[in-house]
Design a protein with these regions (language model features):
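Structural preference for beta-strand elements that scaffold enzyme active sites
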Residues: 6-10, 44, 91-93
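Aromatic-lined carbohydrate-binding/catalytic grooves of carbohydrate-active enzymes
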Residues: 39-77, 102
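Hydrophobic alpha-helical segments, chiefly the membrane-spanning helices
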Residues: 157-163
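Conserved, mostly hydrophobic/aromatic
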Residues: 11, 37, 47, 65, ...
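Hydrophobic or amphipathic alpha-helical targeting/insertion segments
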Residues: 84-101
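Aromatic- and acidic-residue-enriched segments that line the glycan-binding/catalytic groove
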Residues: 57-64, 101-140
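Conserved small/polar residues in nucleotide/adenosyl-binding loops
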Residues: 146-153
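Short, acidic/polar
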Residues: 25-36
């Protein structure tokens, strides 16, 4: 059967179910609600970002794709959740943000240092200095989309500063 005939349920972990009493949802909270999710007739669970992040954009500003953010649990919690989903015949879809990273991601940090490293073209740089902004676009965070603390001073677009 095609995914077109399936029920997809999106979970934003931060607000779904808190398992440890800190007031924020987490992966273990999702695991505790698997029976409820299954009862809804769900086939696929689409989980919003939970990777390590400075949380300036609610997890969409990933700083490490290999680690679950401590806010949501651990890599072991993710493995257990996936096992429980499989046991319940549920499929997991991970909202993997690959169009951009946090300014705290090692790739970005290296890319902004110099034009001569392997990450130099992994981000869009304007080629102009900080006094010649490409346009006046604002981000949803209210700041210019391309401000840069970088020695390169030519970033064309990035997430807001986590400072």
């Amino acid at each position: 059967m095609s995914w077109k005939n399936k029920v997809i349920y999106q979970i934003y972990p931060r607000s779904f179910m808190d398992s440890n009493g800190n007031g924020k949802g987490d992966l273990n909270g999702i695991q505790k609600k698997i029976d409820y999710i299954k009862h809804l007739g769900v086939d696929y669970v689409w989980i919003s970002p939970f990777f390590k992040s400075p949380q300036k954009d609610f997890g969409y500003d990933v700083s490490d794709y290999r680690l679950v953010d401590n806010l949501f649990g651990s890599n072991d919690d993710l493995k257990r959740l996936l096992e429980k989903f499989h046991d319940a015949n549920l499929k997991m879809v991970i909202d993997l943000v690959i169009s951009h990273t946090s300014d705290m991601h090692p790739w970005f940090i290296e890319s902004q240092k110099t034009k001569k490293n392997k990450y130099t073209d992994w981000y869009v740089w304007s080629g102009k200095d900080k006094n010649h902004l490409p346009n006046n676009w604002l981000s949803v965070f209210g700041c210019l989309l391309y401000t840069s603390p970088s020695p390169r001073d030519r970033i064309a677009s990035r997430m807001p500063s986590s400072a």
